[in-house]
Amino acid sequence: MKLSFSLCIFFLISADIVQGTCKKVAQRSPNVNYDFCVKSLGADPKSHSADLQGLGVISANLAIQQGSKIQTFIGRILKSKVDPALKKYLNDCVGLYADAKSSVQEAIADFKSKDYASANVKMSAALDDSVTCEDGFKEKKGIASPVTKENKDYVQLTAISLAITKLLGA
């Protein structure tokens, strides 16, 4: 009986860190939806035992996964016959997401070494890369981004990490 009660308390406290963090993040960042944050962080089993620093690493890893999905999705589009202008913007996005991945990997190392100011700079760079990808499609009339929804999810994931760096004192 005592063990099951202790486990219930542990899971309630764990859920509270995700929900509490997401509440603070959503209040501070216009790029983050509370429900998206809770769903994203809560989907990782490690979030249930993580501290704030750990949630920063988890959200950064989720951003890497989302960036990889976007690159794969773009690769499939590029294998089909596409307008040359669209192809140019998609290729630009592939390069931008490669840069973003490097930035996020460095930010993860910074989180782990508690260099939150550096993690903040690198997560900002990754967020900027995804915005630049999306903005590229607006340069030519009649070209619509096929990755808008995916980019929005990526922006939220990087914004979560970015906001966590600020909560940690960056």
From Swiss-Prot:
Disulfide bonds join 22-37, 93-133. Keywords: Allergen, Disulfide bond, Signal. It comes from Platanus orientalis (Oriental plane-tree). Residues 1-14 form the signal peptide. Belongs to the PMEI family. This is Putative invertase inhibitor. NCBIfam families: PME_inhib. Expressed in pollen (at protein level). Expressed in pollen. It comes from the Eukaryota. GO terms for molecular function: enzyme inhibitor activity. Pfam families: PMEI (PF04043). Induction: Expression of mRNA is induced by ground vehicle traffic-related air pollution. No significant difference in the level of protein expression between pollen samples collected from urban polluted versus unpolluted areas.
